[in-house]
Regions:
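NAD(P)+-binding Rossmann beta1-loop-alpha1 motif at the extreme N-terminus of oxidoreductases
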Residues: 1-50
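Hydrophobic/aromatic beta-strand patches that form the interior of the parallel beta-sheet core
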Residues: 29-31, 51, 89, 112, ...
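Rossmann-like NAD(P)-binding element
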Residues: 55-79, 87
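Glycine-rich, N-terminal phosphate-binding loop of Rossmann-like dinucleotide-binding domains
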Residues: 66, 92, 142
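Rossmann-like NAD(P)(H) cofactor-binding subdomain of soluble oxidoreductases
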Residues: 74-126
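Short beta-strand and adjoining strand-loop segment in the mid-core
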Residues: 126-147
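Single conserved hydrophobic/aromatic residue that forms the stacking wall/gate
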Residues: 145-155
């Protein structure tokens, strides 16, 4: 399985650690605007290599774990790059503005809005915790707008 993670801090980094523990032979691509955070995530095997427009086409999932106010722009940009079977999932808290901004996107059906009820007061990849999402609730929003085909990958 191949996934991409945009934002390799607490939430994205923790997702990567848990994902790797379940899918041991997975490939995890990552990106962070802070080069030090990205390098830390590479050096500590949180992610395997840099996420690019090219390797986005072959992902099973793309996790967007960035500040809420930029999620709509990031999701729109990457929906244009991902393949037809890639599911893009955000980990932000608020959903109304995110979902409304994507209503007219041609690949809206490949986006799943989620709000994991998990976290700590810390940030950055050094605070990534294996098991952060264990026994946590994840609120899924606007599911009717997401295609069943990419959703099938989530089981």
């Amino acid at each position: 399985m191949k996934i991409g993670i945009i934002g390799v801090g607490l939430m994205g980094g923790s997702f990567a650690l848990d994902f790797r523990s379940i899918y041991k032979n997975s490939k995890i691509y990552g990106f962070d605007v802070d080069i030090k955070n990205f390098q830390y995530s590479i050096d500590n095997k949180i992610v395997d290599e840099l996420l690019s427009e090219t390797n986005c086409k072959d992902l099973d999932f793309l996790i967007v774990s960035v500040p809420v106010h930029i999620i709509p722009d990031v999701v729109k940009k990457y929906l244009d790059f991902v393949g037809s079977n890639t599911l893009v999932i955000d980990l932000g808290s608020t959903k109304n503005s995110i979902c409304n901004s994507l209503n007219d996107h041609p690949k809206r059906d490949q986006f799943l809005a989620s709000h994991p009820i998990a976290g700590t007061e810390n940030s950055g990849p050094k605070s990534a915790i294996k098991g952060l999402y264990t026994n946590s609730i994840n609120i899924i929003c606007c599911l009717l707008y997401t295609s069943p085909s990419p959703r099938d990958n989530t089981t």
